[in-house]
Regions:
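Beta-strand-rich binding/interaction modules
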Residues: 94-99, 474-475, 485-567
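Long, ordered, helix-rich scaffold segments
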Residues: 388-389, 518-520, 533, 538-542, ...
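A surface-exposed beta-strand-loop module
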Residues: 84, 90-153, 209-211, 549-559
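Hydrophobic alpha-helical and helix-loop surface patches within well-folded domains
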Residues: 20-33, 93, 113, 217, ...
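N-terminal, polar/Ser/Thr-rich
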Residues: 17-68, 154-158, 178, 475
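Bacterial N-terminal signal peptides
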Residues: 6-16
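Extended, low-hydrophobicity, Ser/Thr/Pro/Gly-biased non-transmembrane segments
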Residues: 74, 133-239, 261-264, 481, ...
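Surface-exposed beta-strand/loop patches in extracellular or lumenal glycoproteins
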Residues: 72-92, 185-191, 460, 507-529
């Protein structure tokens, strides 16, 4: 999520603890809480006391806001303690006792502040074994998607858990850290009309009292608290068959009436799981795999609970006739990521949150590998390119995190789930895999999983396992990417001297955009592999650049190469600055010698040069006509982003007509040929490119014919959803709204109110944020404060409006004027994201306003300070880029048809 995933929840009645869970209607009063006799722990619990097993029993009713629980915790005490500290948040302790040395004694609750619950004893206990019994009550949220929460679908209510990163403590007292990894016994007391799911298959089910049933699940393998999970409600079960060495049963769990929408998930899930098992050469570690649908969107997207993956239904349920290409590819990627976690994160768990990358980066890396293996025609070797680009963009900021960031506060735990951990981590893994070889890397992965199965691991453990079979200690080089932020910029020059082999001169520094206040004085140990023309064909050579400067001899070159690609396969996590005419030579004849991923990578390098101020935007725009005719969808789509990204800040109003005319001249014929509607026999590339090209020409190109057609087709789609292809509808609705009037707004608003399909409802709500008429947009923004739609959905109106220069001010002032009301309605800590409403600004006045308004407010939300710092830095960089590039852009659009030589050169 960003993600953002982990559900942990365990239930269980302990035989030794004869506590009966009170009904939610008549919960016992809370026990008296004492003041702490000594200061409680700060961020981490004392490892001298460890759990060895949990037995948890929960009584949950999806229609109610409270639950009751009883938990028994087997303990191993290494030293005497008089107060035992556990994690617990917003729990009301009703009874507690401790068994030690054959005796039972009272355990008195002790106030530990927001995150902790203490239990004091009449005398010190330990060392030795003990058992803590606790009865308690807690809250079920309809606002948040953490701990235990409940959501409504039609007339039904569903209760689900989400415990990652540290939210199991909202559901039960526990040692809520990943290193405390032990078996769990879970029991749920639920209404007879509800289904109950957890990490393991059901062991037994019996009738309870007053219309309830008691469902006991098999004991789990060792799990940290964040990976325990439950789901309760009138779910339906879709059998997806069995797969793998152990014939693992796979099921799709959906809200009532949604079974028909699980077709694709049921078809694909077993295939993905089987491919993962074959790569790891380790059987799927758990007894079953359920994928459970959460009715509403959440802030975590999907969660890799062992044996019970959870995800928002919008991610994996669709009516068969509405399965778009993006939906199918999206679910396959989600499944590969979450199922990959069953090995990376579940079987082997990081010891502490500073190594979150061992879960998320590895799961992201294996996703690309599995999808490329399964469907090579989908991305043609480019699965990692877009995610890598996202990471490099984030990593160019001074406020960027390290992959392995020290954890000093709750903020750091939450901030760890970002593109640095996921995408940068995956890119660095791919780079070192390429350097040491795929087979050796795969053996290292197998060794890592085997050595640490059912336990915990650290970065040191992982790197030792990867390097064991290679004869290389990769830890020093790898750690330079783990333990410092930033992206290397490698400047490359070609040296050809008579009597010696050609060489590449190399130098490195941190890549920083124009205007950055950061220091470029950083050094990595960078694996650099270059491919080049050698007179007879192509050859490659590699070197580990460990110092500020270095060189790479092109050992197979028979003469000075006609071209050199300094980042073979685009697998290196670095940007390239080409000296002299190297870039021009590489792109001669359209760069036909380059693989698709490499061509995209070179374009990304060009964009980086523009961002750094080392290449003028006007020069890049000279490349656009040729790039727009490229046969590869990915190149054309990248080109539309280059052109479309100009409109917000670099095109003055006086030159908007020239800008629009340029877009129509370059892309117009293709857009008109494509049209808004798909045609029989079209391939997937054509269907996918339509939204990018037609959307650009209709919007930034101001094509009135395409705009009118978008409005007409929108009205038709509102009556018949088959009228427009599912891969195009979002762009079409946006274009229609941008030029739409009050009547169209009323139609879309009315349709959103009536829509029962979750995906279509969300897209209609978001579309209401795309209208440019101020009066219409004011009415749309007001919906974010009404009870007409779920606040998590209606806030999309504000985000859509903030992305458009003509409505950004309205959206930003709406957030400022209604900040407190929004915070009351939105999930807890959602306020951390609200500074991003000002992210699109590009001037000093708005920058100062954003900082003044959010500086103090952001500190009250977990992760808020970093979000604000990111937003402010992005505004600063936009101001600097505008200062460097606006003259070049303006000069180009004053004479867009005049040929200008593009200087690809040097620093």
């Amino acid at each position: 999520m960003k993600t953002l995933r982990c559900l942990v929840f365990a239930l269980l009645p302990l035989v030794a603890c004869q506590h009966q869970v009170a009904t939610t209607a008549a919960a016992p009063e809370s026990a008296k809480v004492q003041a702490a006799p000594s200061p409680p722990p700060a961020l981490r619990l004392d490892e001298a006391t460890r759990p060895t097993r949990y037995a948890l029993k929960l009584k949950v009713i999806p229609t109610e806001d409270v639950f009751t629980g009883a938990i028994d915790i087997d303990l191993a005490l290494q030293k005497p303690v008089s107060t035992l500290w556990l994690n617990g948040t917003e729990l009301k302790i009703q009874e507690a006792s401790l068994e030690f040395g054959g005796q039972s004694m009272a355990a008195s609750p002790v106030d530990g502040g927001k995150e902790l619950i203490g239990f004091s004893f009449p005398r010190a206990i330990g060392p030795g074994k003990a058992k803590l019994h606790v009865k308690y009550a807690g809250a079920v949220s309809t606002r948040d998607s953490r701990g235990l929460f409940r959501q409504q679908e039609s007339d039904d209510w569903y209760l689900i858990s989400q415990f990652e990163s540290h939210y199991a403590r909202l559901a039960f007292p526990c040692f809520d850290e990943p290193s405390f990894k032990v078996p769990w016994q879970v029991t749920l007391e639920v209404r007879k009309g509800d289904q109950a799911f957890s990490n393991t298959p059901v062991a037994s089910e019996r009738d309870g009292e007053d219309g309830f049933k008691v469902v006991t699940f098999r004991e789990t393998k060792p799990l940290p608290s964040y990976l325990v999970a439950i789901g309760v409600g009138p779910f339906e079960v879709v059998d997806a068959g069995r797969t793998g060495r152990n014939a693992t049963p796979v099921r799709i769990i959906v809200p009532r009436g949604k079974s028909g929408e699980a077709r694709y998930a049921a078809e694909v899930s077993p295939v993905i799981l089987d491919l993962l098992e074959k790569y790891f050469d380790i059987p799927y570690p758990y007894e079953k795999l359920d994928v459970l649908s959460i009715p509403l969107p959440t802030n975590f997207g999907a969660m890799e609970n062992a044996g019970l993956v959870t995800a928002s239904q919008i991610a994996f349920l669709a009516k068969p006739e509405r399965e778009s290409i993006q939906f199918r590819r999206g679910y396959a990627g989600l499944a590969a990521h979450e199922f990959g976690h069953m090995w990376f994160g579940d079987l082997v768990t990081m010891a502490w949150w500073d190594d979150t990358w061992l879960n998320e980066a590895l799961a992201s890396w294996i996703t690309s590998k599995i999808i490329e293996q399964w469907k090579p025609d989908w991305y043609r070797g480019t699965t990692w390119i877009n995610s890598k680009s996202r990471a490099t963009s984030e990593d160019s900021l001074v406020t960027a995190r390290k992959i392995r960031q020290p954890i000093d506060s709750e903020h750091d735990i939450v901030n760890a789930f970002d593109s640095i951990t996921y995408q940068k981590g995956a890119a660095v893994l791919s780079m070192f895999e390429h350097w040491i070889g795929e087979e050796a890397f795969q053996r290292g992965i197998h060794r890592y999983l085997q050595q640490h199965a059912w336990g915990n691991a650290t970065a040191r453990d992982f790197l030792a396992a990867i390097g064991a079979d290679t004869g290389r200690d990769i830890a020093p080089a790898f750690s330079t990417f783990l333990d410092q932020p930033g992206l290397p910029l490698v400047t490359v020059g070609l040296q050809c001297e008579r009597g010696s082999k050609p060489k590449l001169s190399l130098s490195q520094e941190r890549y920083l955009p124009a205007g950055s206040q950061g220091s470029a004085d950083q050094v990595w140990q960078v694996p650099i592999c270059a491919r080049y023309e050698n007179g007879k064909g192509q050859a490659r050579d590699c070197v580990l650049l460990t110092q500020k400067t270095g060189e790479l001899e092109l050992a197979s070159a028979q003469r000075c190469p006609a071209w050199v690609l300094p980042n073979e396969g685009e697998l290196g996590y670095y940007r390239v600055l080409y000296s002299g005419d190297l870039l021009a030579r590489l792109l001669k004849d359209g760069g036909k010698q380059l693989a698709l991923a490499e061509r995209i990578g070179v374009l990304d390098d060009v964009n980086a040069l523009v961002g750094r101020g080392k290449m003028l935007y006007g020069e890049v725009l000279q490349l656009v006509p040729a790039l727009s005719k490229d046969p590869h969808r990915e190149i054309v789509t990248s080109t539309t982003r280059i052109v479309g990204g100009l409109k917000s800040h670099l095109i003055p109003e006086s030159l908007r007509p020239s800008y629009a005319q340029f877009i129509r001249r370059v892309f117009g014929a293709r857009a008109r040929k494509l049209g808004w509607r798909s045609k029989p026999g079209e391939d997937e590339d054509t269907r996918l490119i339509r939204a990018a090209v037609v959307g650009l020409v209709a919007d930034a190109g101001e094509d009135r014919v395409l705009q009118a057609e978008a409005r007409r087709l929108t009205r038709r789609w509102l009556r018949d959803c088959s009228a427009v292809d599912a891969d195009t509808i979002d762009t079409l609705l946006s274009v229609a709204a941008q030029s739409g009037d009050q009547a169209l707004f009323v139609e879309i608003h009315s349709a959103a109110q009536k829509e029962t399909d979750r995906r279509d409802r969300v897209r209609l709500i978001q579309t209401m944020g795309a209208f440019r008429d101020p009066a219409i947009e004011k009415a749309a923004l007001a919906l974010a404060l009404s009870n007409e739609f779920d606040p998590r959905d209606s806030l999309r109106i504000m985000w859509r409006a903030s992305a458009e220069s003509r409505t950004r001010d309205m959206a930003y002032h709406f957030v400022k004027q209604n900040f407190d009301r929004l915070i009351e309605r939105l999930p807890r800590d959602s306020g951390a994201s609200l500074p991003a409403a000002g992210r699109g600004y590009c001037d000093g006045d708005h920058r100062r306003d954003v900082e003044a308004f959010f500086k103090d407010r952001s500190t009250t939300f977990t992760g808020g300070p970093r979000t604000l710092a990111n937003v402010l830095e992005q505004i600063d960089l936009c101001v600097a880029l505008k200062r460097v590039q606006e003259r070049s852009v303006e000069a180009f659009f004053r004479q867009p048809e005049r040929p200008v030589r593009a200087h690809f050169g040097s620093n």
